[in-house]
Amino acid sequence: MIAMPTLLSADQRQTLPATLPHWTVHEQSISRELVFNDFNEAFGFMSRVALLAEGRNHHPNWSNVYNRVSITLSTHDLGGLSDLDVELAAAIDQLLPA
């Protein structure tokens, strides 16, 4: 049985800059901009994220222009930022070099 996502409380949202320092917190989403060496590196990263997202059945809004990837996470069914977004953001961060 898959757990239902829950919207983050105001207190939980306030802790996000400490737990996800590379992400920007918005009213109903979080976002991150990434720059890679070239298109192949950016696309390879997106492929790895796609596998993570598919495994969680939670998919980012994103775009790619050459070596840049823009990611926005929000739980549309709930109309805002949920625990699923935080979990996916943390998993995405784990794909990147420290």
Swiss-Prot record:
Pfam families: Pterin_4a. Transmembrane segments: none annotated. Keywords: Lyase. Its EC number is 4.2.1.96. GO terms for molecular function: 4-alpha-hydroxytetrahydrobiopterin dehydratase activity. It is an enzyme of class 4 (lyase). It catalyses: (4aS,6R)-4a-hydroxy-L-erythro-5,6,7,8-tetrahydrobiopterin = (6R)-L-erythro-6,7-dihydrobiopterin + H2O. GO terms for biological process: tetrahydrobiopterin biosynthetic process. It comes from the Bacteria. The keyword Lyase applies. Belongs to the pterin-4-alpha-carbinolamine dehydratase family. NCBIfam families: PRK00823.1-2, PRK00823.1-3. This is Putative pterin-4-alpha-carbinolamine dehydratase. It comes from Parasynechococcus marenigrum (strain WH8102).
